[in-house]
Swiss-Prot record:
GO terms for molecular function: C-C chemokine binding; C-C chemokine receptor activity; C-X-C chemokine receptor activity; chemokine receptor activity; G protein-coupled receptor activity; interleukin-8 binding; interleukin-8 receptor activity. Belongs to the G-protein coupled receptor 1 family. Phosphorylated upon ligand binding; which is required for desensitization. The keyword Ion transport does not apply. The lineage of its organism: Eukaryota, Metazoa, Chordata, Craniata, Vertebrata. Coiled coil: none annotated. Interacts with IL8. Interacts with GNAI2. This is C-X-C chemokine receptor type 2. Glycans are attached at residues 8, 23, 201-202. It is a multi-pass membrane protein.
Length: 359
């Protein structure tokens, strides 16, 4: 991941329209020497619509992920392994979403926050994106070990899980360093500044690197891990006789399905764009504009994932609902009778009490 579109300046007069395709896909602009004039469609209406969507996603993520963090921290004495992952995931998604208003403002006014904040916000969004996806893969492995192998040794040692989370954050930081190093500001015209990678004369080479990095570690590898782990987990649940089996399967299906719906379309379009920009398929103005529009639309789906995770991992699950109702009952927002009527959550999984598969 890496770039945010800024479409509010004269594209024909600078970079021959390539800045218009400036998006969150780590797609550095062409240099003047390799750019070809290509008029870009007017996206004013789309730009303002995207700004509204960014703000809504931020608000939904703020509410949803804050509630997840509140419930987990309030019940930290009974915190499970899955809860540790969920807490880190909520933090990552929350900070990812909090960067969106900045990029929304840049769509209207260009980048107005200076070179240092260009690096900081880009770096923060990059780290939180990587950590979010890597933590999703860790959760799938946790469920796989807990259900398929009924593993309790690693699960019971919470400090090891915390070490795994710290490792994921560190790995995310390392993967994000190219963005921090290369991202800077540039004047697109006398009145507009943009925030993007400055890669000099090695544009084509670095473009491939900055595309392969997020697509491999930010999508393909986590997806393969999730498909493998959840595939075997589902097979085990089908064979088992568990009272909450169908509920657990719904959550697992939702995890994979929503991840695919959010990120698969974007990555398909991004891969096509990479093939075009590396001259493996013919580049035309019509094709470039079509891909730019597709990147804009599918990018929004990817951003939506940051506010959908609380729904998938928490709101569907019994454990979260009971934890939230417990907090509300303690503050008199719901009656104790209602809390008792709802009952305590039950979980599916191994004999270990330190993991749940229904969240």
């Amino acid at each position: 991941m890496g770039e945010i579109r800024v479409d509010n300046f004269s594209l024909e007069d600078f970079f021959s329209g390539d800045i218009d395709s400036y998006n969150y896909s780590s797609d550095p602009p062409f240099t003047l020497s390799d750019a070809a004039p290509c008029p870009s469609a007017n996206l004013d209406i789309n730009r303002y619509a995207v700004v509204v969507i960014y703000v809504l996603v931020t608000l939904l993520s703020l509410v949803g992920n804050s509630l997840v963090m509140l419930v987990i921290l309030y019940n930290r004495s009974t915190c499970s392994v899955t809860d540790v992952y969920l807490l880190n995931l909520a933090i990552a998604d929350l900070f990812f979403a909090l960067t969106l208003p900045v990029w929304a403002a840049s769509k209207v006014n260009g980048w107005i926050f200076g070179s240092f904040l260009c690096k900081v916000f880009s770096f923060l969004q990059e780290i939180t994106f990587y950590s979010s996806v890597l933590l999703l893969a860790c959760i799938s492995m946790d469920r796989y070990l807990a259900i398929v192998h009924a593993t309790s040794t690693l699960i019971q040692k919470r400090h090891l899980v915390k070490f795994v989370c710290i490792t994921m954050w560190f790995l995310s930081l390392v993967l994000s360093l190219p963005i921090f190093i290369l991202r800077t500001t540039v004047k697109a015209n006398p009145s507009t500044v943009v925030c993007y990678e400055n890669i000099g004369n090695n544009t084509s080479k670095w473009r491939v690197v900055l595309r392969i990095l997020p697509q491999t570690y930010g999508f393909l590898l986590p997806l393969l891990i999730m498909l493998f782990c959840y595939g075997f987990t589902l097979r085990t649940l089908f064979k088992a006789h568990m009272g909450q089996k169908h509920r657990a399967m719904r959550v697992i299906f939702a995890v994979v399905l929503v991840f695919l719906l959010c990120w698969l379309p974007y990555n398909i379009v991004l891969f096509t764009d990479t093939l075009m920009r590396t001259k493996l398929i013919k580049e035309t103005c019509e094709r470039q504009n079509e891909i730019n529009k597709a990147l804009e639309a599918t990018e929004i789906l990817g951003f939506l994932h940051s506010c959908l995770n609380p729904i998938i991992y928490a709101f569907i699950g019994q454990k979260f609902r009971h934890g939230l109702l417990k907090i509300m009952a303690n503050y008199g927002l719901v009656s104790k009778e209602f809390l008792a009527k709802e009952g305590r959550p039950s979980f599916v999984g191994s004999s270990s009490a330190n993991t749940s598969t229904t969240l």
